[in-house]
């Protein structure tokens, strides 16, 4: 039935005259390009680079009624370090009574009587957070404790979680191995033991993990359990090498929460139990190629338009797609020009990569190529495309991939007969810059202060520290980088030009805007820094997956955001070129580390994150290669409600950013 429905969609006639398609045109998408040296940067990201390393276990709690009318739950709490913490998440209810049973003596204790500290705190990202109770222990006996939760009478909250966190050096490394997150496809994960961000060779021999499985929460809320194997037959390399693999079929569109569970025994004999949480969006296969060739035709003195014929359903006409491809051509020599297509395979040379974000028009997706790249490479008109990816522009999931694709060229631009000095120009990298007219340009210049995901007014109290500024106020929103970028552009269209100072996701959205769309950023000439960001998770944050798991029980809050996951951020970055990154100046922060005391930005998120972190992002995930690192400052946290002052309240940094900003 699914195949019939899919085929019917693809055969439906396309109705192109759609207002939403027309409304996308004012965004004036750029036509990106760059030299062959950047091919590797623009290729699909290696999945293992976005892996999560977990020191925690998120254990579901479901209270059941007892004969006496009270409610009860118990579970195993594996403790592998004398310094240990756990949190209970009960959606703010206060009637959960927590006790622990010693694995050696069998004696039961209230958690409060054993804990060296018990505090109420919140776990989350910006305004999307969940309350919890944190219990910390300094001299806990290792072993499998029993944790009990009771209520007198009916509980305020029937379901929740226990989050256990250990100071043990043994971690759980896991990641999704494939990018084709499409209905009907299999989603594959692997997991293994690791330590200090590196897989240890002796762990491969010892293999602390004896059992692993995936608990998958489907978009409709149902759950399924799938075993993972270390047998060499499940995408896990060799049998008994410590790497476990498993997969499941994605039969619904929407967001999946995948929890990897792994248990076993550490080399020191203590129990090993870790989980990691991943958010995985799955979309429909809305488009397919209508031809195995692309066609190119001259559209100006310097430019070619490359067209992909596509079959699509009706919904696809309202969707933006990101195209990325490499252009290769035959060496421009008389001897090789005599060869047929099959005969020139060994004579092809790289010309450039190209990319854009666009929509379907007249059953085609179109992208442009500046013919000066062909001239630079001294290639003939015999061209082909390689490593073609056509992705949806919200999650950056590839819908179409082709290793090689012939490119039929009707004619080359006239510039082929003109002299070209070999210098790479802005037009070659970004496309033809629109001419501002009195009808299209705004008035004056401005510095835009942009917030992040699900954010409150983080810049408002400090706007006076930024001269000639305007505050972007799309608060408490959960939107993709692409939608976020378009909203910034529309807000900034009031002015002739603007620069950006951005917090959190706002930094990634601003970079996305400059990369793919013409806006006031491209006309800002005053100042030294076009885009400045503070606390931006360019490589995502593990918290995004944990929030999805909690949201399945307590409600989604602002909602799940795939662009903020480590794998989603990696997919997005695999289309951001060097020339765009170079326009970014970024800042990171963390708590002040004092050896004599426990320091943190957020008690709850510190259980998940690797030091140093700002309570939301780890320092290493806030780096952006190709951009300018303006430094890491301690004593500042991601938001105002954390243990140190919020990043946006740093007056010294704010005045400096204002003085250096483009407008």
State what each model feature region is.
Residues 117-135, 141, 232-248, 352, ...:
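Aromatic sugar-binding surface patches on proteins
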Residues 81-85, 137-156:
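Noncatalytic modules at the cell exterior or secretory-pathway interfaces
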Residues 55-65, 91-131, 163:
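Surface-exposed beta-strand/loop patches in noncatalytic accessory domains
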Residues 92, 307, 370-450, 454-461:
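Flexible, membrane-associating and regulatory peripheral segments of lipid-active enzymes
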Residues 91-95, 180-183, 195-210, 311-323:
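A short beta-turn/strand-edge loop motif at beta-sheet boundaries
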Residues 24, 425-663:
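Lipid deacylating catalytic domains
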Residues 184-201, 213, 260, 307, ...:
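Beta-strand-rich structural segments
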Residues 62-64, 68-71, 162-199, 279-300, ...:
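Short, compositionally biased P/S/T/A/G/V-rich stretches that sit at domain boundaries
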